[in-house]
Amino acid sequence: MQFLSPQMEQKLHRATIHQITVSKTGDMPIRFRLRHLNYRNNKKQKNGKDKETTPPPTTTGAKEPLVNGHSAAVNGMNGHTSEGEQQKDKTAAEDKKKPDSDVMEIIQDTGFTVQILSPGVEPLSIQVSSMELVQEIHQLLMDREDTCHRTCFSLQLDGVTLDNFAELKNIEGLKEGSIIKVVEEPYTMREARIHVRHVRDLLKSMDPADAYNGVDCSSLTFLHTITQGDILEKKKGRSESVDCTPPEHIMPGAKDRPLLPLQPGVGKKGPQPLKVLTTSAWNPPPGPRKLHGDLMYLYVVTMEDKRFHISACPRGFFINQSSDDVFDPRPDNPSYLCHSLIDLLSQISPTFRRCFAQMQKKRTQRHPFERVATPYQVYTWSAPALEHTIDAIRAEDTFSSKLGYEEHIPGQTRDWNEELQTTRELPRETLPERLLRERAIFKVHSDFVTAATRGAMAVIDGNVMAINPGEDAKMQMFIWNNIFFSLGFDVRDHYKELGGDAAAFVAPRNDLHGVRVYSAVDVEGLYTLGTVVIDYRGYRVTAQSIIPGILEREQEQSVVYGSIDFGKTVLSHEKYLELLNNAGKHLKILPHSVLNEKEEEIELCSSVECKGIIGNDGRHYILDLLRTFPPDVNFLKLDEELSKDCKALGFPIEHKHKLSCLRQELLEAFVESRYLMFIKHAAFQLQQLNSAKLKQKQEAKDSKDSEKKEEPKAIEAAPVAKEPAKKDAAESNNNVESKEECPKKGSTDKAKDKSAGVPKVETEEAKKLMESLLSSDEKNESKEVVKRACEAVGSLKEYEFDIRFNPDVYSPGIKHVDNQSAANSLKKQKQLVKDAAEFLVKHQIPSFVHDCLDHTAAPMDGTTLTETLHSRGINVRYLGKVANLLAKIKQLEYLHTIAVSELIIRAAKHIFTSYMQNTEMMSMAAAISHFLNCFLTATTAVSHSGSLSESDALTKSGSSGGKQQRRQNKRSAGSKGGKPSFQCTQDNNEWQLLTPKSLWSQIEKELKSYWDYELLPAGAHDSADPVVSHYRLQKISLLRAFCLKTGVQILLREYNFEMKNKPTFGESDIVNVFPVVKHINPRASDAYNFYTTGQSKIQQGYFKDGYDLISEALNLLNNVYGAMHPENAQCLRMLARLSYIMGDPQEALAIQQRAVLMSERVNGIDHPYTIAEYAPLALYCFANSQISTALKLLYRARYLATIVCGENHPDIALLDSNISLILHAVGEYELSLRFLEHALALNIKYYGEKSLKVAVSYHLVARTQSCMGDFRSALNNEKETYAIYKQQLGETHEKTQESSECLRHLTQQAVVLQKKMNDIYSNGKLTSGLPPIHIQPPSMGSVLDMLNAINGIIFVQISSKEIANLKNEIEKRQKEGGTSEQAAAAQASQEEVDRMLTETMAKTAAGIPFEDHDKHELPVAAEASSSKQADNSSNASAQQVS
């Protein structure tokens, strides 16, 4: 590169970065795809997608709340905290430095319209942005229906060809209304291949095979199948004409859980334009034909059964005279020379012309989100039987040693390490720079994950040559496409002391956690390797980018920091100490010293195993981060005792390995709780010290005593934060400086710490008290107080709060430098690690269980349960203890079931891993189906009869001895490519020996040894059945969870688990095995900041401001992640809800439809997040009068939920209430009642018989029964409602009175009915004169109000008259209550009036009586400030009621 001009280098760099931003072949670049496809498909949509959205009112202002922490963001985005906070501090500082115009530049780039002239097509006007590249117009044209068949063309403006990588703003003469011409260019070999591949992609664009096979980042979506097309294009209509009857399997109490409805509409075949399109066996052209311009040959069989051989030349494609057995490349007569292959095929095949037009129409009608590639591959656990077609390009992709050409920067294999590190080095001063940097980081990372996954599969499948082929299969290592692959086995007894293979299996996952946190901290100058951990076919493969130069020298020569032999030889390095110390402040890692074998003192700022290597590129890399965090002593056998509480709970549990570490989330929560304790302790002591002095100063006693009464309250009232705000408490390390030296600095540090999750008022009072005393003369006394507080919380500094952890504190074989009298003695360091582990058991787990009792975000399956535990720092190895706690709480029975099924699945996965390693490739399908039979059914019949016949047939064809001999030879030649399954042939049929009884006894043992969990009923584990019935598990849910955990894909059909005579699963039911991939998730930090600010605005009631900020967050997310990402889906859901609350249900529907589509694509069609997206979409459909669509969506959500977790779940209660209300609206009272009664039963179970939710359910049941004429039952149910309201809200409350009125009406109707019935019985006929029975069918408006209410949205109407009355009442009360001084203050304090007003509204919305003493209990949310409300005659404010 040194010989390139600076301009050329810059252009190449731009090309590289662009390569990063362009996705797979034929897809549009992310940013462009998003805007133009949506602009075209959905002009009505006005949020978040177009970069021309209005920016937030003041961006710099908007960022200010972020400096106070993430209070609003606890469940906003699902990333990790440390990066967010560190970026946040940085961003805040940088935003002060830079002018607003910089921030706006990226958000409001200028848009203008240009005209595109293509040959043979009408002129086309498109909207472009000045920031786009010419390449993006290229991609747009390749995606449009009328121009998609062109790939080899240039764009010209006034006769000048435009540079593909130039930004539009840099092109001279390009302005509003400019005409750009499309000029066909001559083909080269590469362009011809690109064209053929593009044509093939167009022909299979409607085929779901790629999504089922898990390739090219395709994934499934069924939303439009369920709603029968785009919801937005439907006509509004009442649903009387539509059949609203739910399928039988969706009805409450249905026992069947069919699998086929999971993928509706599967098996419908689209139009088929060609039988075969493939490269010809006559390739490549011989020398003489090259000189005539032949580039390649194709072979085509049309639907009319005609066979053609086609030549590609620089001018296009033509028919030649070759046949299957005669090579004659001369042009045929006629030869139909066409520049586009599509045009040629249209001329030779009328069927092709017709079908291709139909396909194009269908393709462009699909929502853009249905066809955009996802950033990471999503695999589906069930698939229909797919037809396998001839596809030369697929074959070429599979067997070529390179990846498809789209993965290459021209002329070289990608240097992953260079790309990953260069993107991190991009500037990040301004918002536009940060966006470009994060976008590049994300794109390179997702490409790396794709390549690493492909490589790992190739390694296990035996398609890659090992770099040490002579060694045993388990010890082999591989390099493929500049990525290094190693297997999860204990090579060279490296982990012998730590647990051998068990430790080697866990180490890559721990290492990945380390890479994640160091990447998130993002210290400039410190580099981590690109790391991906792949589990495939029972093997764990670690894929890493390669440090430049590391392969040229021995590891001993490379390492300049850390130890390669677990602490015997330890090295340190000044630069590494500086870099790691900076990172360690954020990660709570304590710098510490150890002794090497020469007894020399070596300082470290990380664990001993962490190695520092300076690459040939001069960068400082760290690797082997498996002990980034301190060990979890609850799972280690130590010489020291644990606390009594931990021992009582059965700890320590000894694991197979010694690499159990605490999570970063736990350490942050622990440090925060200790800091709170420190502040309270010190403030309380200082307050007591002060009160002693005050007694000596009699003259000031009266005035000071009044202050003292308030302050102790403030200090004593500070409770431990129930859910510490997720703050990177890097500041905490130096929170309280040594006070005697620098009081001012100490005070600023404390001010900074207001956000550390401490209850504000009380803690601030405590701090003020401390500061006022610390600035006094008696420094020695206050110094003593701080010292005592430090001792009380176990601080590692005598006069400062300093809680950090030494990760090596319990590492075997490491000698520590210990100063026993110091504050940071080894004993204290060890105690802190023990305390943190105890904090997990005594505080985090009970608080998790307690918080689950309100069922607000109830986990639906093992994955969501695991995420929830991790967010609190609870490792999955504590799941057994969590399950035991849950078992004791009746309301959490559903969560106990989920926890137990997750335990069983994980235990089964552990056994399955080694089971797969002992199975040879030819028996794989038979072995997996046999395992599933043993795991889920009671039958002992083995399902492998078919498999044996197949392999027997192959074995008999040649002598088995010869076969064995060949294998042995292969092995000694080292060409078995890391397939340990070929190690010993006699093991090949070991899998057949497994029985249901032996498998379940292994599962029982695994549960006991790993989780200390006793599986009930004890001793009755011959098969799954006793366990399933005891814990109320569902076999279909277990099957789904097992397949997702292990990567097994099964055939989509109905499985009968109760069959006694033949096995449930046969080998034909195992369709595929996919990799399970773990990797880090790079974050969009600025978008995160906008999102959290928007959330806090919404919580304050400023919905419009919140909407603008979250729209902007979506904009930035689209910039960084592209169109598809789980965080984009969260943003869309929030925007839809805001649109609905602000009175635009149509807009809400448009946005929520995109949220559902995106969630299906990036999370999976049956992921709990996707299920959660369906319910709001149904609500917005109902609000837009699309009643039958709303029901279909709710039926879909309920069906998916029953597959995932069964009917016993709080979310099912909500879904059933929604379904019943809509069925009630269309007059299907009997069906409605079945769903309502089920919802009522669940609500009583989860919320208690006297909760307001249950009262609402009783009322809905009564309402439905009265519509059916069953007044007696209705009366009984309404009495329940009345009793609950009376008890909870009091007799005078509006709700109680409404219920009372309802009772009166029902009683009246019941009396009328009874009289009529008596009349009939006595006389045999009706006498006239009785009033008619009034059965009032509900209005759509009343049903919608009720739907809003049960979904947590209530609109409160407050007229200006009511506002005026309320203000007068408040002022009157204040005047009565106080002195003239207070009255004056009351008049002046408009804010107080506003606050009380919003509280009144919130109380009204929640249906709670407004009383003086409980005003502070409810979080306030009003749509606008109350001064605005007073001006409006009637104002609707939407409250979100949990």
Curated annotation (Swiss-Prot):
It is found in: Cytoplasm. mRNA-binding protein involved in proper cytoplasmic distribution of mitochondria. Its main location: cytoplasm. Residues 949-958, 1424-1442 have a biased composition (Polar residues). InterPro entries: CLU-central, CLU_dom, CLU_N, CLU_prot, GSKIP_dom_sf, TPR-like_helical_dom_sf. This is Clustered mitochondria protein homolog. It comes from Aedes aegypti. Keywords: Cytoplasm, Repeat, TPR repeat. Residues 394-636 form the Clu domain. Belongs to the CLU family. The keyword Repeat applies. PANTHER family: CLUSTERED MITOCHONDRIA PROTEIN HOMOLOG, EUKARYOTIC TRANSLATION INITIATION FACTOR 3 SUBUNIT EIF-3. TPR repeats lie at residues 1087-1120, 1213-1246, 1248-1281. One of its GO terms (molecular function) is mRNA binding. Residues 38-100, 237-258, 696-763, 949-984, 1373-1442 are annotated as: Disordered. Residues 82-100, 696-714, 737-763 have a biased composition (Basic and acidic residues). CDD domains: CLU-central. One of its GO terms (cellular component) is cytoplasm.
